[in-house]
Design a protein with these regions (language model features):
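Catalytic cores of nucleotide-sugar-dependent glycosyltransferases that transfer UDP/GDP/TDP-activated
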Residues: 1-322
Length: 322
């Protein structure tokens, strides 16, 4: 009221439901709010599980005019599965003002036609120029020039991203006649140590390169030069990796959760029209699930190159992330 917002409408967007701002009710008094005890009610800010605490995210849901998350599928997940981290009841009570709006990309940054960080720019109609970027990627990472697909992972290395499947994907790629590149780091010391060990183990392998850390220019080159990216997330509110991959004509191989379901449509099993099918999907959390998708993707690249080229075209034409 003091800053003239008493009559304004409020839209509250939530990306991660895990961090809810659960704290003691003393915060309400410290904030100088009038009649704070009125807010400490089950239908307002009182946490649904710890009745001695307030839940600031719950309060945001209750008092906002509209609440969004970053994909339609994730909106369903947080209402009806444990991905709501205890807020499912509140979201269901307020479901008329809650929905998912798909995330998008900044096309001033992620756009193959104007990307200054890749050696050769290209568009939907000249995807064959990806091969020039693939050659540049191999040259930079000291991979050998062979008739092999390049499979990549770009992103954080942690449990949410399916780190056990990322590791398995590396081994599967090399065992199936593909090359594998990784760009990522982990906030977890044990995971970070594990991937440094893998990096040293594969240091002299001409079909594998692991870059621990983050390099913006290399990230762009990987998206432009790789044939496929893997994204075996355990949960994914939206995901940007698959959106970038699609824009760059790079086929995503994803686990069917959250925003990945809203953006990636399996080439073989989706009920979408064929021209809208743009990648591969699996649902299990084990290695066999990832295998089932990777074997189809690698097999298409190896044995049906024209069909794979058409899939890349469909990926680049995907109407997502806008």
């Amino acid at each position: 009221q003091h800053i003239g917002m008493a009559g304004q409408r409020v839209c509250y967007t939530i990306h991660n439901f895990k961090h809810q701002g659960i704290t003691g009710e003393h915060v309400l008094y410290a904030a100088g709010l009038p009649h704070p005890h009125h807010l400490f009610q089950p239908e307002r800010l009182q946490d649904d599980f710890n009745h001695a605490a307030i839940n600031l995210m719950k309060g945001g849901v209750v008092y906002s005019n509209f609440v969004t998350t970053v994909s339609p599928k994730h909106a369903h997940e947080v209402m009806y599965t444990d991905q709501g981290h205890g807020l499912g009841h509140t979201l269901n009570v307020h479901q008329r003002k809650f929905g998912g709006i798909l995330n998008g990309l900044d096309y001033d940054v992620w756009n193959t036609e104007v990307d200054e960080l890749i050696p050769v720019r290209y568009g939907v109609d000249d995807l064959e120029k990806k091969y020039d970027n693939k050659a540049a990627l191999r040259h930079r990472l000291l991979l050998r020039e062979e008739f092999k697909p390049v499979i990549a992972y770009v992103g954080r290395l942690d449990a949410q991203k399916g780190v056990h499947l990322i590791r398995h994907g590396l081994h599967y790629a090399l065992g199936s006649g593909a090359q594998f590149v990784l760009l990522g780091s982990s906030p977890d010391a044990d995971i970070d140590r594990e991937f440094w060990h893998l990096k040293h183990h594969f240091n002299n392998n001409p079909d594998c390169h692991l870059e621990i850390g983050y390099d913006e220019e290399l990230a762009h080159l990987i998206y432009a030069g790789a044939d496929m990216v893997i994204m075996p997330s355990m949960f994914e509110p939206c995901g940007l990796t698959q959106l970038i991959a699609l824009k760059y004509g790079t086929v995503p191989i994803v686990r069917g959760v959250g925003g990945l379901i809203d953006t990636v449509f399996d080439r073989d099993y989706s009920d979408k029209p064929e021209h809208e099918r743009n990648g591969y999907m699996f649902y299990q959390t084990d290695e066999q699930g990832l295998d089932s998708a990777m074997v189809r993707a690698v097999g298409l690249w190896q044995h049906h190159p024209e069909d794979f080229r058409q899939l890349c075209q469909a990926s680049a034409n995907s109407d997502v992330g806008h």
